[in-house]
């Protein structure tokens, strides 16, 4: 079996567009903690973690929102940050256009022998991108999160592979950029 070789390598440096980093990878738990603390400290925000909206009634000057804890709140601005199947968006009558690409994501974490140097790597091929996102070391080894986009049937086949075959396929798909995954 041959190892696929990348056809073309493009290095993107954030400094090409700014002296600031292009982005940061922030763990979800840290984002949630910091956002929660900031909201709790804001006197004009009523932060109700664990409480869902159940009904939205809008008028020109304000909206009335019924909550899962049995209360109601009034607001001049309602933000629907409740996911891709947003109930707030539906109740507000905001339509959505969806494009399906026939892809599924496999997401997991791996260790590897070559340090990632805090650099994300994305490899594009048919089926979708294969992305390595730096994570802190795990048990003394460099570690990365992987988001592997594939067509639905290929993603299913990959997820059903025996571990050894999957690891070989994963390392080949990464072009062994960080060594065997």
Regions found by a protein language model. Name each.
Residues 64, 78-181:
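Conserved FAD-binding catalytic core of PHBH/FMO-like flavoproteins
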Residues 1-91, 99-104:
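Conserved N-terminal helical subregion
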């Amino acid at each position: 079996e041959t190892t696929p070789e990348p056809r073309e390598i493009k290095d993107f440096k954030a400094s090409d567009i700014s002296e600031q980093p292009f982005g940061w990878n922030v763990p979800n738990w840290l984002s949630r903690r910091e956002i929660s603390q900031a909201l709790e400290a804001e006197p004009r925000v009523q932060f109700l973690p664990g409480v869902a909206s159940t009904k939205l009634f809008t008028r020109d000057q304000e909206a009335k929102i019924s909550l899962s804890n049995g209360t109601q709140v009034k607001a001049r601005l309602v933000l629907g940050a409740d996911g891709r199947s947003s109930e707030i968006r539906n109740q507000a009558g905001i339509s959505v256009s969806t494009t399906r690409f026939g892809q599924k994501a496999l997401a997991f974490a791996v260790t590897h022998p070559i340090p990632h140097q805090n650099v994300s790597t994305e490899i594009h091929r048919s089926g979708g991108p294969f992305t390595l996102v730096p994570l802190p070391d795990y048990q003394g080894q460099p570690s990365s999160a992987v988001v592997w986009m594939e067509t639905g049937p290929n993603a299913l086949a990959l997820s059903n592979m025996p571990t050894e075959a999957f690891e070989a396929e994963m390392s080949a798909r990464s072009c062994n950029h960080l060594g065997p995954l």
